[in-house]
Amino acid sequence: MLQVIKRNCEQVNFDKSKISDAILKAMKNGSGIVKPKIAESIASEIEDECRDKQEVSISDIESMVYDKLITKKQRLTAKAYEGYRSIREF
């Protein structure tokens, strides 16, 4: 099972629902338009990209989320997501 390395170096099992939940929160706080299909699609794409890895860092996942939001023309959501990420890293 894919392991995620958190900021405190703890390892946890990969859970794509955490990714989609974070995206949905960013959508609500960014554009105010919540699009569950886009959030689920991004989470699934990241899961597929990481499938062959044994571990991935939370910062790598966050970068992938941000890039995919931009690619899917979700700029306001990406900005809200990036703001949340900056606070967490601080």
Language-model region placement:
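Long, C-terminal-biased catalytic regions of enzyme "large/alpha" subunits
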Residues: M1-F90
